[in-house]
Amino acid sequence: MNMHGRRRGWSLMVSGGLLSAMVCAFLLSGCGKSSEAEIAPLACLAGPDAYLTALDGAPDKVELSGGTKISDCLVPRQSGGELATIGADLVAAATTLNSNAIDDPSGPSSLRAGYLLGAVEKAAWSSNGIHTDLVRRVSAAASYIPQGDDPSLLQPGFDQGLEAGRSRG
């Protein structure tokens, strides 16, 4: 093969590679636009204390600032960063409520922990599975019972809150 044949072959390979890359980029750019991340309300990013304050109204009126329900914080196609931030805040709030409920089982924290879990479950039902792990984490944090303690320690307040959160969360 002469020198021109090698150049021509190389030129076709480079052009073919560029064409393939351009087609892939075009197809991927179209895909990204149809599945853009949804954004949760700003009130959902106010930290765990905002959730704890809102839960003071459980089992009745539980709202973050601006009338935002806890279930509104978990949206379909949520970005990973936003989900991580909101998820950490929800788990922190659930952990605080659980600790308070263990210290005072007859107090309101058990009901509030149940409500929080119910609201997270409600949101997760319509989010195509992206919040499944968060539901498990909030459930573990909200319903934790230390080894050796009575498993019914948090009931019935927890169950009442759970049902309220699932329906009104």
What does each model-found stretch correspond to?
Residues C31-T95, G165-G169:
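Extracytoplasmic low-complexity, Pro/Thr/Ser/Ala/Gly-rich segments
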Residues M1-C31:
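Sec-dependent bacterial lipoprotein signal peptides
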Residues L18-S20, K61, D104:
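Generic detector of short alpha-helix boundary/capping microenvironments
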